[in-house]
Amino acid sequence: MRTCPRLLPLLTLALVPLALATQALAAPSPVDPRIGRLLDQLGKVQAIEQVQLSPDGQHLAWVVRRHDKPSIEIARADGSDAHPLAMAGAPGSCRQEELAWTPDSHRLAFLSDCGGKPGDLDVYTSDVGADGKVRRLADLDGYAQALSWSADGRTLAFLYVEGATRRASAVAAAKPAAGEVGVEGLEIQRIATVPAAGGAPSMASPADRYVYEFSWSPDARCFAYVAAPAPGDNNWWVAKLYAQDARAGAAPRVLVDPGRVQGPLHGLQIALPRWSPDGTRLAFIGGLMSDQGSTGGDLYAVPAAGGAPVNLTPGIHATPAWFAWTSPRTLLVSQVSNGQSQLADYAVDATHATQQRVHFTLPASVGDGSASMAMSLSADHRQLAFAQSSYAAAPEVHAGPLERGAPAAVTAINASLKPSWGKAESVEWDHDGRHVQGWLLYPANYDPAQRYPMIVSVHGGPAAAVIPRWPGVGYGSVPFSTLGYFVFMPNPRGSFGQGEAYVQANRKDFGHGDLSDILAGVDAIEKKLPVDDQRLGLTGWSYGGFMSMFAPTQTQRFHAVVAGAGIANWQSYYGENLIDQWMIPYFGASVYDDPAVYARSSAIGFIKQVKTPTLVVVGDRDAECPAPQSFEFWHALRAQGVPTSLVVYPNEGHHFVDPAHQRDVLQRALEWFGKYLPAGSR
């Protein structure tokens, strides 16, 4: 479950509490002036959502979000001569997003609603020349993403949901249930193509397959893609790898079915299929993944003509998240390494990929926005570009020669922003035979002679990792440091960054081994720093929300909790969510075949142990971690007289999109900890 996966059905049983919670949003409690200033500061960041370097390495394009509207800017590769992509309307008055340079670097394809109704995105191209001519390439009636040109530049392909009513993502607000569930109203994402001269989209992939991602073959004749039957939100965890002729109506063939293969890939997930430059094989990432888009695992390869997949990187102690072929025998790999972003070269033969040179390791989040930790490369693989941020530096575009290591920023979009929180450091400890890592933020204006409270923030997933990044106004733990807290963000077993065995170490053990890793980390910090053990707090979203509900049933160490989009009862959750396929790889069986393994990790079964004041927050259309789970936990706490509050946000999914709600949920969390875990030094 991302920062959690999809649902809605039984919300009707909570209509009255939901109405009350919704009304409460209209009259929030007074804002502490410090909180108001902090929220204002967080709201000033301009997010860089995508970066693309032209194939000839001469130009950059990026998507920057200002005032909740994405817009495109184009510059030379060194960041100079930056200017908005010119269209009708003032910059920021309409949407411009998604980027794809033509192979000859002469044109940039993108999506925009600037030429039509707000929200109705069509495909456009812009010439890079002096006139910057923009023309509409295709009219769309639905949701599109992942623009990609064929190698010959004759065809633009993209993922397309014709007639879509929502963004194609499990974290988006769920479509209200109506009609025959699982049969009526299904929205199928397919590969669509448009000629370079323009025209109506043509569907290339079958109507009975939901496509999650794809790539062109080097000769522009075929697609490789990851797909599954509908509903798409639920079935990514059982998706297969296909190859298909690029012409419409061609029949796909299965290259890899994780449900049938033998060996380490059996029953796991696959992502990021990429053709080798000579077209003879496909590489991909395979591993235990809790969320589409949160990619991590081992590198695999399979012959393009068919055959058994081979694990190229068994036993490595990092987690590859993205890669690109740089020759038939070399890969450039972005990976999570001990809580940091790392870019490395791998040498590849028929059966193994071996790490060679490390280009850089950064305590920062990096990526071009097209996939997790992706790099945008020039055609000769000598130049790269991406967006980067950390706890110390707000997002900027970074670009430069690959051979020179980590490139410098070439923009100053957020140069005026400075952190109001304390310094960050990586913390490491050993527990239960494993090495564990996490990140610690010191309180702002830290004084070693004083004692401070500490908030433990558990990441979502669980297959994910905390890597330093600049916070926005949405829910997150960094702002607590500004108000005088230590903030501890662990990467316990189940996280990315220390190899696939570490990721799989919390199978059938949610809330037990991983919680013990976290508590051991708290102990290690308390031995070195002036943390007040009587003022420990706990928070998290998605899987972190589950942990925030479960941990207080196992320990009394935490004195205040904020649980975001959590899971209180894995048994009832199994029948409520819309993404139950993710659970069997983790629990080993369905709840109907092994209810005990689900009960073992359910907070509701140990609810009598909870004494901790808990704020519970959730979106009413969260399909990944549905609202009934939050109601169930809140109701149980109320019945026992434990101080608690439940806030439900209308029309929100797993990831909140309304800026007012993003601000409100963080404000409430800051005030909750301020009430039950005051940050004054002692």
Features from the language model and the residues they span:
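Short loop/turn segments that connect beta-strands within beta-propeller blades
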Residues: 76-80, 127-131, 195-199, 245-249, ...
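Hydrophobic beta-strand positions that form the internal "hydrophobic ladder"
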Residues: 57-60, 108-109, 153-156, 223, ...
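Beta-strand-rich domains and repeat architectures in extracellular enzymes and scaffolds
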Residues: 40-70
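A flexible loop/linker signature enriched in serine peptidases of the S9 family
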Residues: 64-73, 89-95, 111-124, 139-145, ...
